[in-house]
Structures are given as structure tokens and as C-alpha cells.
Amino acid sequence: MLISTKGRYALRMVIALAKLEKEKKAPVSLKDIAEAECVSMKYLEQLARCLSSKGIITSSRGKYGGYRLSDQPKNILAGDVLRAAEGSTAPVSCLEGDTPCPRQDVCTTESIRRGLDAVIEKYIDSVTLADLLKE
């Protein structure tokens, strides 16, 4: 699995959000996250939509609005953040989606690909946001 810039920035965004939310004890603006992570507001807006649509963060409007984590850091998985941003964590494109590869029955590398996919999924789903905050 190659984690794209979008996936890395999504992880950075939720880590920064967790830190800033803990400090402020209030919703956090994208401006504050952008400044903390040196990422453009426009890019964070795209990520916020992805993360919000998957229920990882929530937003509120108004003078005291902003973003919050939808759950405690110990309950938010790195895998969920990456899947929200990336769409898929499959190591090869033929493992993505519901349609099986037409060469599945004769493919000599399928077991390696499936094994690799299982290891990646297991690992990223074992790392929580709380774990990342400790680093």
C-alpha cells in the first residue's frame, strides 16, 4: 500500500485536531489546523469533507463553530482515517472493489496479494489515534 499525500495529511489533520481540541476544550477551526500543520485551508476543506462524511470528525457552524473528533482518540483507527481519505487501502488495484479479477482462478500471485492486504489491514486497524498522539 502506498499512502498518498491525501492519506498522510488526513492523519496529520486528525492528530492536530485532537491536540488542539484538548488544548482549547472547544471546536477547532481549519485555520488553526492549517497553521499548526502548514497545510493549505483549501486542502484541509477537502479532507474535512471526507473525514466528516465517514463520521470521523464533526463540524459546527457559527461564531464558536469548528471541528471536533467524533469519538475519543482511543476509538479512532488509523485505518478508518486512511480509508476515508484514500478510499481503499488495497496494495494492488485488482483487490479493490467488489468485482473479482477475471484472472483470479489462474493468477499465481493472488495469495501474496491477499496476504499482504490482510497484513496491512490488520496493522492499520491496530493503530489508534491515541497511539499516534503518544509519538
How should each PLM-predicted stretch be described?
Residues M1-V14:
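Short alpha-helical segments that sit at the start of domains
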Residues V28-C38:
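A short alpha-helical element within helix-turn-helix/winged-helix DNA-binding domains
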Residues S70-E135:
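Non-DNA-binding regulatory cores of transcription-related proteins
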Residues G55-L69:
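Beta-hairpin "wing" of winged helix-turn-helix
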Residues A48-R49:
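Short, hydrophobic-biased segments on the C-terminal half of alpha helices
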Residues M13-L20, A84:
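Short amphipathic alpha-helical elements of helix-turn-helix/winged-helix folds
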Residues E35, S52-S53:
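Alpha-helical residues within the helix-turn-helix
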